[in-house]
Amino acid sequence: MAEPVLVVGLGNPGPQYATTRHNIGFMVADVLADRMGETFKVHKKSGAEVTTGRLAGRPVVLAKPRVYMNESGRQVGPLAKFYSIAPTDVVIIHDELDIDFGRIRLKAGGGVAGHNGLRSVGSALSTNDFQRVRVGIGRPPGQKSGASFVLEPFNSRERPELGTIIEQAADATELLIELGIEPAQNTVHAWS
């Protein structure tokens, strides 16, 4: 039987953040839960919203932390431990300033590029050797700080494309689970 995968969409809890750029990981996780035919419930040991099922033929634990982005590791670490999932079988879905809006990139290991949610996860897992589905949100215009940009809703130019991008990020996540990092990168990175 295939080993389980922990897939975590990063974001901030609360309705005031639901449509912000930083919450694209939550948006993708919601699509994946729909594809699995499952709903999220609070996991007592970790405090995260969790559902279990199968994606791409593998058992999956799908989660959305219920703490602020910068503290995500507080719930991801206990989930990985509870389900006995190795860091290399953890997939984090997150927003990425350094990638143009709408582009999706897959990565395994490496630095966190100033993303405090990833830093928190790496600290909790004692390694950065987890996999990532990086959903491009682009850089802020002008002199606007990245910190304020990620907490803003998608603008009127971006919103019409958002549904397609979220579906593609969910597709990319399933390919990563099914094929592994390099074959999935070859496919996903050719999309744009």
UniProtKB/Swiss-Prot annotation:
The record marks D95 as: Stabilizes the basic form of H active site to accept a proton. TRNA binds at Y17, Y68, N70, N116. Its EC number is 3.1.1.29. Keywords: Cytoplasm, Hydrolase, RNA-binding, tRNA-binding. One of its GO terms (biological process) is protein quality control for misfolded or incompletely synthesized proteins. The record marks N12 as: Discriminates between blocked and unblocked aminoacyl-tRNA. It is an enzyme of class 3 (hydrolase). It is found in: Cytoplasm. One of its GO terms (cellular component) is cytoplasm. Pfam families: Pept_tRNA_hydro. It catalyses: an N-acyl-L-alpha-aminoacyl-tRNA + H2O = an N-acyl-L-amino acid + a tRNA + H(+). GO terms for molecular function: peptidyl-tRNA hydrolase activity; tRNA binding. The keyword tRNA-binding applies. The active site is at H22 (proton acceptor). Monomer. Hydrolyzes ribosome-free peptidyl-tRNAs (with 1 or more amino acids incorporated), which drop off the ribosome during protein synthesis, or as a result of ribosome stalling. Belongs to the PTH family. This is Peptidyl-tRNA hydrolase. It comes from Mycolicibacterium gilvum (strain PYR-GCK) (Mycobacterium gilvum (strain PYR-GCK)). The gene is pth.
